[in-house]
Every structure is written in C-alpha cells, then in structure tokens.
Amino acid sequence: ARTTLVVDETMVDLWFDAPPPPPLASFCPNGNVITLGSAGKSFWGGLRLGWVRAPARTIAALAQTRDTLDLGSPLLEQLATLWLIENGDTFLPARREMLRERRDRCAALLREHFPEWRFQMPEGGLSYWVELPDMLAPQLATRAEAAGIHLGTGTRFGLSGSFDRYLRMPFSLETAELESALMRIKPLWLALNKGGQAFKRPFV
C-alpha cells in the first residue's frame, strides 16, 4: 500500500488499432500513482517537454526538487504544449494514421529484405521490437553505428543479456528516409549473417 507506482504513458496517444484502456491511475484515485506523459512522443519530437500527473503532495515535492536542478522549461514551449493538449483531438487522428502507414511500410520492407528477422505488428507507438537470430543484434548495431545509423539494442532494456537478440527499429521516419536507412543496413546484415542463420519457427 505504501509503494509508489510510476506509469509510463508516453505512447498512449499513438494507438492505431484500438483506443487504449483508461489511465491506470483512474483505477486507484486515492493511491500514490505517478503518470508520465511526453509532448515529444504525442505531438512532435522537437518539443522536448513532458508532464507528470500525481497527488498534489507529490507534485509539490517534485517541483521543489526541480528548482534545484534547472531554471525551468521555456514559457513559449509550455504554452504551445498546453494548446496541443487541449486541441489534440483535432490533429492526433492524422498523426496516428501517418504512423500507421509508416508502420505498415516498414513491415513490408522488413519482410522483403530481412526475412530472417522476427517481429509482431505493434498496435501503437513509434518502433518495432525486432528479434534477430544467433545473438547478432549487438554486432549489427555496432556496424550500423559506424555507418552513421543508430539502432537501439535490447541490451540496454534488460539485464544479464536477456534481450541481446533484439533491436528497437523505429518506423517514424518519412518513407523515403526509412527505405534508405534499411537499404544501408541490408548489406551490413548480409555480411554479418553469411551463414544464413534463421529461426526454425515461422516468421510472424
């Protein structure tokens, strides 16, 4: 009962197939629940602002702590974010549709050019969680980094190598940029996977 629950809802506005369930905090109105949101995820990546919803005493403590760390966020960006939150229903549907199209295009490219990789279609968000055979994901990420392409490896998202097989593959780029990046990754993958390693289980 004394545990503080921190809920990351930074992607909650970016659903494609079905609306998300109500906020977790709504099921525990008197509990100590901290919910995190992000204008950069919901609206535009260049808007480096987020928000926190929590009990008043928690917000007061966080605000006091923040005063010792920085001078605050730019007022103009805060006002822009407030307007976006209040008017999100007018343009979030178009953003979701754009991301849905990019998700689908990325899936088609992955299936065509990287048949050894496995993934599931995300129901929302900005990226795929891709599984590579034979623990090759960290090596591919290193080679891609040298070529100027940053891929997030699963290593940073788990302990003891539990996600070393995975890459986080964003699909939020414009289609031409996405295709260009994947075509640059393809020869790196082919050189790395000379033995043609693949999963024995069916591709999803």
Region spans (language model):
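Active-site PLP attachment segment
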Residues: 26-61, 73-76
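PLP-dependent enzyme catalytic core of the Aspartate aminotransferase-like
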Residues: 146-147, 159-204
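Short, conserved charged micro-motifs
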Residues: 135-142, 176-180
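Active-site pre-lysine segment of PLP-dependent enzymes
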Residues: 1-5, 9-42
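Conserved glycine-rich beta-strand-loop-beta hairpin in the small C-terminal domain of fold type I
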Residues: 82, 99-107, 117-131
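Structural signature of PLP-dependent enzymes
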Residues: 62-69, 85-107
